[in-house]
Amino acid sequence: MTTFTHINHQGEANMVDVSAKQDTVREARAEAFVRMSPATLEMILSGQHHKGDVFATARIAGIQAAKRTWELIPLCHPLLLSKVEVNLTALPEISSVRVESICKLSGKTGVEMEALTAASIAALTIYDMCKAVQKDIVIEQVRLLEKSGGKSGHFIAE
């Protein structure tokens, strides 16, 4: 059975020691969906939102969040990210925005949490910018899509 890596032998939360691990190229992709009314989505897409460019703001927020994941999640290591990308795609057929984040580095530990944090914060930023016109926006399906590098191997979500 696999054990929790952040719990020591006494059952206490502990930061994993990665000092003996070899650097490898690691990459992770995550996504989130932001469901809203067609009118709210149209406001974003037409550039009529009074707060400005929602997609640009969400993209920057996601990038900033990835870089600060170690400050937000207690046992995450500070990482020297070599790439953070946040892509936003309007999906009018389901009245949603899909947020996809990609994080990459050459290092001793994975970037899954950074990718998940980037997607989550970008989605939260969309909510924040649009809550004045619609309060019942739903953020859903935040998940890891893919990770590569490291000893646990390659993972692709089904």
Curated annotation (Swiss-Prot):
Record: active site: 128
Pathway the protein contributes to: Cofactor biosynthesis; molybdopterin biosynthesis
GO biological process annotation, one example: Mo-molybdopterin cofactor biosynthetic process
Signal peptide location: none
Gene3D superfamilies: Molybdopterin cofactor biosynthesis C (MoaC) domain (3.30.70.640)
GO molecular function: cyclic pyranopterin monophosphate synthase activity; GTP 3',8'-cyclase activity
Keywords attached to this entry: Lyase, Molybdenum cofactor biosynthesis
CDD domains noted in UniProt: MoaC_PE
Entry keyword Nuclease: no
Cross-referenced InterPro entries: MoaC, MoaC_bact/euk, MoaC_sf, MoCo_biosynth_MoaA/MoaC, Mopterin_CF_biosynth-C_dom
Reactions catalysed according to its record: (8S)-3',8-cyclo-7,8-dihydroguanosine 5'-triphosphate = cyclic pyranopterin phosphate + diphosphate
Binding, substrate: 75-77, 113-114
E.C. no: 4.6.1.17
UniProt xrefs under NCBIfam families: moaC, PRK09364.1
Function recorded in the entry: Catalyzes the conversion of (8S)-3',8-cyclo-7,8-dihydroguanosine 5'-triphosphate to cyclic pyranopterin monophosphate (cPMP).
PANTHER family, sorted: MOLYBDENUM COFACTOR BIOSYNTHESIS PROTEIN 1, MOLYBDOPTERIN COFACTOR SYNTHESIS PROTEIN A
Subunit and interaction comment: Homohexamer; trimer of dimers.
Family: Belongs to the MoaC family.
Name of the protein described by the UniProt record: Cyclic pyranopterin monophosphate synthase
